[in-house]
């Protein structure tokens, strides 16, 4: 794997004008990632501001009810901000600060990454502009309000389908014009190199902690690690420290209303090779290669592609990727809430649902770790509308 590619995936498919900013970012990242002052500062904020390490919790009642493997939950829902997004938000914002940048640009769909960027910007005294499709601004009013409270400016994007992919285009356009003093803070393991590597590294704290915690709790590594996959950062973060171990890595995509309906967001299961957002990966696209609309009950999984390292892990056979439907995810949401007193994000509920599917087929001494990537408060409206399953 050369630096820029994971197998054949990844790369830098960007206009000439972005090559220089990306080079500068790569150089800065390589310099600061081993810099003691940078790492001590990041460590300090992760511990005292964000609340790391997060617990690894044995879901005893759920495990016993299913009657198979032991299910452990990596509690990223307890992180400041309510989801794993904070790890990358503070990591990249601090990197930008060390690079001498004074402004952060982000794009957001469901608003979670926008909130994480706004939080980090407020903490470090940086200006934050968040691009958001006008459609999403309507759908995610609370997160728009939250970003405003944190001092960020939300810029609604009226072009194209007025959703995430249009927000991405606007954010890139802004960065080309302002990179001297702005950093483009990408929210997942996507985009042109070096972003997939940077985001994976900042999220790997999840897997490093989980690995230590399970060895302490059980004296052995898990048999399987399960995480939901949209762009793929929470999954990459928990998978990466286990890649060289004999551990099944299972990514769960949004099956929506079923793959056969076309209403889903499962790029690894149903997508084609393509180039978008500066990278070569799997995308949901039509015959003309245009990105097609996605559907999921969970707004955070509806990215139309997937990070290049996941594409590589799939093609190499190191990880397996499955789908869970809206209905199965909602069922898992209710089951975890009632059995363990934890309301998961609908994204994370996809991973819980798949763990619930495989646990009964496994032995009682086998172990599954589920990355509980976020809490469910933001989804209560949707759950109320959909009703009980």
From Swiss-Prot:
Signal peptide: none annotated. Pathway: Amino-acid biosynthesis; L-tryptophan biosynthesis; L-tryptophan from chorismate: step 5/5. Gene3D superfamilies: 3.40.50.1100. Its EC number is 4.2.1.20. Its cofactor is pyridoxal 5'-phosphate. It comes from Thermococcus kodakarensis (strain ATCC BAA-918 / JCM 12380 / KOD1) (Pyrococcus kodakaraensis (strain KOD1)). The keyword Zinc-finger does not apply. The modification N6-(pyridoxal phosphate)lysine is found at residue 85. Tetramer of two alpha and two beta chains. Keywords: Amino-acid biosynthesis, Aromatic amino acid biosynthesis, Lyase, Pyridoxal phosphate, Tryptophan biosynthesis. The beta subunit is responsible for the synthesis of L-tryptophan from indole and L-serine. The gene is trpB1. Belongs to the TrpB family. The lineage of its organism: Archaea, Methanobacteriati, Methanobacteriota, Thermococci, Thermococcales. PANTHER family: TRYPTOPHAN SYNTHASE (PTHR48077:SF3), TRYPTOPHAN SYNTHASE-RELATED (PTHR48077). It catalyses: (1S,2R)-1-C-(indol-3-yl)glycerol 3-phosphate + L-serine = D-glyceraldehyde 3-phosphate + L-tryptophan + H2O. GO terms for molecular function: tryptophan synthase activity. One of its GO terms (biological process) is L-tryptophan biosynthetic process. It comes from the Archaea. This is Tryptophan synthase beta chain 1. It is an enzyme of class 4 (lyase). GO terms for cellular component: cytoplasm.
